[in-house]
C-alpha cells in the first residue's frame, strides 16, 4: 500500500489550519504566612493594589500591602484551610460584587453571596467595589427632600436627596431605629434602600430584616450583612460593596438611600487589619489613611447632573460614641466629611424623650434647600423655642417663684417637646407633620394638658383624614400651606370636639 506525498501534505496542512495556539500564563506566588485574616505571599511581583487574588482552595483575597519582598493579602473568607506553602495566583481583576434588581428583597454578604436561604442571586451584572466619586461638574446641588417620617428630623434637621447626614450617639440611644424608620417611610416613594450592617450580632440583623418585612419595606431594600463573627476583611469591605450596589441604581437615574450601620466598627476592623499588616499606627492606633477610608466612601453619595441621569444616593452613616464624646478621632473625622449630623443624647433618651435628638448640636448644612416651604413656615422658630425652654427649665429647678410670662414659655416648651415625641416604627407623612406643627405654632395646644398632647395629635390626624383629606393632598402636592383659612377652620372644628382626659372623666362621672 503506497501513500501519496500529496495526501500527507494535505493532512499536515489541515492539522496546521485547525491548530489553536492557546497559552495560559498565570502569575503565581507562595504563601509564606497566614493568620488573623491576613496572608503574606512572595513571587507576585506584578500584583496591583486592591487586586483580587485566588488561593488554591478557591478562597479569594485582596492585595493590600505591596512590599519589596512580598505582598500582604487580606483574606475574604475562611482562612483555616490556607496553609504556608500554598499557591496563590493573580486574577488581573479588582474586587467586584453583583448588582441590579435581583438583589432587592435579599440579604447578602459583602461579596454579594446570598445568606438568606432563598437560593442564589440571578444576575450577570457586577460593579467594582472601589470607584472614583463623581466630580464637581458631574453633580447637582441638593434640592429635593428625603422625608424620614420623623417629625423632629424633617422639621429641624431636614435631609435632601444626595446628602450625607451622620447619625451619631452612644450605644442604645436609637440610632438604628432612626435608620430603619427612614427606610420604612420610603414606601411608595420610588426609593431604593440599602442597609449595610457592619459588625452586628446576627440575631440583631435578623430582627431588623423581619421588621422591614413586616412593614413591607424589604421589597425595595437590599441588606448587606457583615456580622461580628465574620473576618475583619469582610467588615472592612462591606460599606464599599453596599455603595457599589447603590451606584448601579444611581447611574440608572434612580434615587437611593444607603445606611452604614456603623462605620465605627468598620474603622476598628481596618485598624485590626492594618496592625496585622504592620502598617505604622497613628492616633488611637488607627492607620494614617483612616480619614481617606471614610472620605472616599462617603463622597460616592451624590445627586448626579441631568447629563448623567439625575439619580441620587443619600448616605446616612452611623457612628457610635463613648460617653457622648464627639471629639474622639473617628467621630470628628466623619463629622468633617458629612453635610451635617443628627446627635442623639443619652440623657434625653433615658428621660423618655424619644427620638432623643439634641436640637442644639444637630444640624443639616444643605438639607434646608430641600425642605418644603410648608415645613419651613411651621418649624421656623422651633429650634429657638426648644433652646429657650431648655435654658428656662434648667433655671426653674432652683425655685418655683416664676412670673406668668416665664411660666407660659415653660408650658409651651413642655408641649413642644411632647409633640416631638414619636413612637418606634411609626413614621408620619409630611402633610400630617405640617398640620401638627401648624397647630402647635398657632396656639391650638396651649390649653391641652401635656399628657393629652400625643392623643390630640393622633385624633387630629384621624379627623383630618376623615373630613379634610383635600387639605392633606394640597400640602403633599404643592409643598405649600393651603390658601385661605381652610386649615384654621378645620383645626377650630376639631378643637371644639376634642375632650381632655379630665373632661372625659367628668362626663363619665356625670353619666354614672
Curated annotation (Swiss-Prot):
The keyword Ion transport applies. GO terms for molecular function: ADP binding; ATP binding; proton-transporting ATP synthase activity, rotational mechanism. It catalyses: ATP + H2O + 4 H(+)(in) = ADP + phosphate + 5 H(+)(out). Its EC number is 7.1.2.2. F-type ATPases have 2 components, CF(1) - the catalytic core - and CF(0) - the membrane proton channel. CF(1) has five subunits: alpha(3), beta(3), gamma(1), delta(1), epsilon(1). CF(0) has three main subunits: a(1), b(2) and c(9-12). The alpha and beta chains form an alternating ring which encloses part of the gamma chain. CF(1) is attached to CF(0) by a central stalk formed by the gamma and epsilon chains, while a peripheral stalk is formed by the delta and b chains. Produces ATP from ADP in the presence of a proton gradient across the membrane. The alpha chain is a regulatory subunit. Belongs to the ATPase alpha/beta chains family. This is ATP synthase subunit alpha. The gene is atpA.
Amino acid at each position: 500500500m503506497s501513500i501519496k506525498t500529496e495526501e500527507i501534505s494535505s493532512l499536515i496542512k489541515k492539522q496546521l489550519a485547525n491548530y489553536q495556539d492557546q497559552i495560559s500564563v498565570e502569575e503565581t506566588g507562595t504563601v509564606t504566612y497566614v493568620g488573623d485574616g491576613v496572608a503574606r505571599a512572595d513571587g507576585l511581583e506584578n500584583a496591583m493594589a486592591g487586586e483580587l487574588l485566588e488561593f488554591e482552595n478557591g478562597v479569594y483575597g485582596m492585595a493590600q500591602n505591596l512590599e519589596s519582598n512580598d505582598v500582604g493579602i487580606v483574606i475574604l473568607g475562611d482562612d483555616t484551610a490556607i496553609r504556608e506553602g500554598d499557591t496563590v495566583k493573580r486574577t488581573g481583576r479588582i474586587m467586584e460584587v453583583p448588582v441590579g434588581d435581583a438583589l432587592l428583597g435579599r440579604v447578602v454578604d459583602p461579596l454579594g453571596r446570598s445568606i438568606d436561604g432563598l437560593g442564589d442571586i440571578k444576575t450577570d451584572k457586577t460593579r467594582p467595589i472601589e470607584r472614583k466619586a463623581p466630580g464637581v461638574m458631574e453633580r447637582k446641588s441638593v434640592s429635593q427632600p428625603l422625608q424620614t417620617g420623623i417629625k423632629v428630623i424633617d422639621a429641624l434637621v431636614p435631609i435632601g436627596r444626595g446628602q450625607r447626614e451622620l447619625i451619631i450617639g452612644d450605644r442604645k440611644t436609637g440610632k438604628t431605629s432612626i435608620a430603619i424608620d427612614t427606610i420604612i417611610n420610603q414606601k411608595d416613594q420610588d426609593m431604593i434602600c440599602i442597609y449595610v450592617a457592619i459588625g452586628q450580632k446576627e440575631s440583631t440583623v435578623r430582627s431588623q430584616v423581619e421588621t422591614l418585612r413586616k412593614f413591607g419595606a424589604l421589597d425595595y431594600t437590599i441588606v448587606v450583612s457583615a456580622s461580628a463573627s465574620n473576618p475583619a476583611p469582610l467588615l472592612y469591605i462591606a460599606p464599599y460593596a453596599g455603595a457599589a450596589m447603590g451606584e448601579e441604581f444611581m447611574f440608572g437615574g434612580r434615587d437611593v438611600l444607603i445606611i452604614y450601620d456603623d462605620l465605627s466598627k468598620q474603622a476598628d476592623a481596618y485598624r485590626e487589619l492594618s496592625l496585622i499588616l504592620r502598617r505604622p499606627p497613628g492616633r488611637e492606633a488607627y492607620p494614617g489613611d483612616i480619614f481617606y477610608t471614610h472620605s472616599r466612601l462617603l463622597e460616592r453619595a451624590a445627586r448626579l447632573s441631568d447629563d448623567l441621569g439625575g439619580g441620587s444616593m443619600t448616605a446616612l452613616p452611623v457612628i457610635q460614641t463613648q460617653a457622648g464624646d464627639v471629639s474622639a478621632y473617628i467621630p470628628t473625622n466623619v463629622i468633617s466629611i458629612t453635610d451635617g449630623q443628627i446627635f442623639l443624647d443619652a440623657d434625653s433618651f433615658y428621660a423618655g424623650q424619644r427620638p432623643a435628638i439634641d436640637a442644639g448640636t444637630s444640624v443639616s448644612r444643605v438639607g434646608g434647600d430641600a425642605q418644603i416651604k410648608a415645613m419651613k413656615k411651621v418649624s421656623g422658630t422651633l429650634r429657638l423655642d426648644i433652646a429657650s425652654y431648655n435654658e428656662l427649665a434648667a433655671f426653674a429647678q432652683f425655685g418655683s417663684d416664676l412670673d406668668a410670662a416665664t411660666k407660659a414659655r415653660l408650658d409651651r416648651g413642655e408641649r413642644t417637646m411632647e409633640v416631638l415625641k414619636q413612637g418606634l416604627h411609626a413614621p408620619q407623612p409630611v402633610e400630617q407633620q405640617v398640620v401638627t406643627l401648624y397647630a402647635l405654632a398657632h396656639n391650638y395646644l396651649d390649653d391641652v394638658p401635656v399628657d393629652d398632647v400625643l392623643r390630640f395629635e393622633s385624633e387630629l390626624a384621624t379627623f383630618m383624614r376623615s373630613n379634610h383629606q383635600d387639605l392633606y393632598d394640597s400640602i403633599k402636592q404643592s409643598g405649600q400651606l393651603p390658601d385661605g383659612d381652610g386649615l384654621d377652620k378645620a383645626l377650630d372644628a376639631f378643637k371644639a370636639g376634642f375632650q381632655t382626659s379630665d373632661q372625659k372623666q367628668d362626663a363619665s362621672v356625670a353619666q354614672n
